[in-house]
Regions:
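Alpha/beta enzyme core
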Residues: 2-244, 250, 254-283, 287, ...
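Conserved small/polar residues in nucleotide/adenosyl-binding loops
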Residues: 300-306
Length: 306
């Protein structure tokens, strides 16, 4: 009897799945890497069918899906449910789970335990951590256990308050040097890729040139090795304010609103459902049904009079 596991071990790609070493090859060939967020099975499947290389189950779900004002309230349990759904839909892309605030800040041990949960309970291929500094030992610990890690520097939403709000980072020489140092440190700690968020394009391009691992930009210009956008932003689903780096490729909020409004109008005017939306019953069976129901109603009326 075969003992081969149905689910590949961490770092071992499933058949047909993009392998992490291929990302380095894409960087070497200057082939842009496409990453997009997803939060459920349908969005994961559509991202896969559209040709995305990486799918990030972002803690941005706290805002786009769960209705919070920031990413901070996202919990491990919520992120695991969302990631599990995405992995059911996305087969070829690498699925990366965003470690939410509080899941890795306390200690290396807790960070590793939560990363293991993502792999075991949701089927994630990798995890993403924000920041450098104390995050470096967390990265080393997780990578040491065989779980791939994506880094994230620049604007890190989980610590936006400490950074002075949702603002671009690295806009002075000193801060740009710090960003480069953080990115290099994350690479040395074992990250297979690094997100650069809200970083001036020339700074992001220089960081990309100096790193051997791929960079994924969001608001970091066209000189990074790849790009990422939030699902709800690029589809025009998110109704809040969007950063300047967002490009909307559709206005699905309007499309959906119009569709639901049309449905509501049809229901109220009794235009829906039509005959094509209903199920038939043979005439003889309908007659028997009515006869039976009528007899039962008659017997009930007699009992009530008694």
């Amino acid at each position: 009897m075969s003992t081969r596991p149905r689910t590949p071990a961490p770092g071992t790609p499933a058949p047909g799945k993009l392998a992490i070493p291929e990302l380095a090859g894409m960087k070497a060939r200057r082939q842009p890497i496409v990453m997009v967020t997803a939060y459920d099975a349908p969005s994961g499947r559509l991202a896969d069918e559209a040709g995305a290389d990486l799918v990030l189950v972002g803690d941005s779900a706290a805002m786009t899906v769960l209705g919070h004002d920031s990413t901070v309230p996202a919990t491990m349990d919520e992120m695991i449910v969302l990631t599990r759904a995405v992995t059911r839909g996305a087969r070829r892309p690498l699925v990366i789970a965003d470690m939410p605030f509080g899941s890795f800040q306390v200690s290396d041990t807790e960070a590793l335990e939560n990363a293991i949960r993502f792999v075991k309970e949701s089927g994630a291929d990798a995890v993403k951590l924000e920041g450098a500094g104390p995050t470096l030992t967390r990265v080393s610990s997780i990578v040491g256990a065989g779980i791939p890690v994506m880094g994230h520097v620049g604007l890190t939403p989980q610590s936006a308050t400490m950074l002075g709000g949702f603002k671009a980072q690295g806009r002075s020489a000193d801060k740009a040097v710090r960003l480069l140092a953080d990115a290099l440190a994350l690479e040395a700690a074992g990250c297979f890729s690094i997100v650069l968020e809200a970083v001036p394009a020339p700074v992001a391009e220089e960081i990309t040139r100096r790193l051997t691992v791929p960079t994924i930009g969001i608001g970091a210009g066209a000189g990074t090795d790849g790009q990422v956008l939030v699902w709800h932003d690029l589809l025009g689903l998110y109704q809040g304010s969007s950063p300047r780096f967002v490009k909307r490729y559709a206005d699905l909020a309007t499309t959906i609103r119009d569709a639901v409004s049309a449905y509501a109008a049809d229901v109220r005017e009794r235009r829906f459902p039509e005959d094509v939306h209903t199920y038939a019953i043979p005439e003889d069976e309908l007659a028997a049904f009515r006869e039976t129901v009528g007899a039962e109603i008659g017997r009930a009326s007699c009992r009530e009079r008694v």
